[in-house]
Amino acid sequence: LLIALPVGFLVIGPVITILTNMLATGFDSLLAFSPILFGLIVGFFWQVLVMFGLHWSLIPIAILQLGTMGYATALTGMFGASFAQTAAVAAMYFRLKNPKEKALVLPAVISGICGVTEPAIYGLSLPKKKPFVFSMIGGAVSGAFMTAMGVRSYVMGGLGVFGIPS
């Protein structure tokens, strides 16, 4: 604790803050350049950003859009990635042979439907690698499609089914 606390506050915290600010600037520029490309990239990398806690770099962009335009397009790229991760884990149920692993699928799918994909990522798809890659591809396709169709979010809501009304 005497070592971890100062290292966390003095080294890791500032590095993550710098990375988050750089990502936010890059994402903002990409969104202005090509919304479809933005949706593709955000959808593809969303789960990786979640793993490293860098997904918070998109929230200020969405808040700024909501405040100035009344809607946010920055949220659409990440929305489909959550469902892609959930679908990949649900599909794993039919491929898994180990009953202990199969028992993890239902709780991960339920939490994924509600917008919390960490159990699906860390418990099932990341250890198997292929489902994680397929969920990234699905997230990219859905992110590009949703931004191409002009999907907007009018309020800050969660991911998953509870975010659909927003």
Feature-to-residue mapping (PLM):
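Alpha-helical transmembrane segments in multi-pass membrane proteins
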Residues: A4, G8, F38, V42, ...
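Signature of multi-pass transmembrane helix bundles
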Residues: L1-Q47, F162-S166
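Membrane-interfacial helix-loop connectors
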Residues: M51-K102, P165
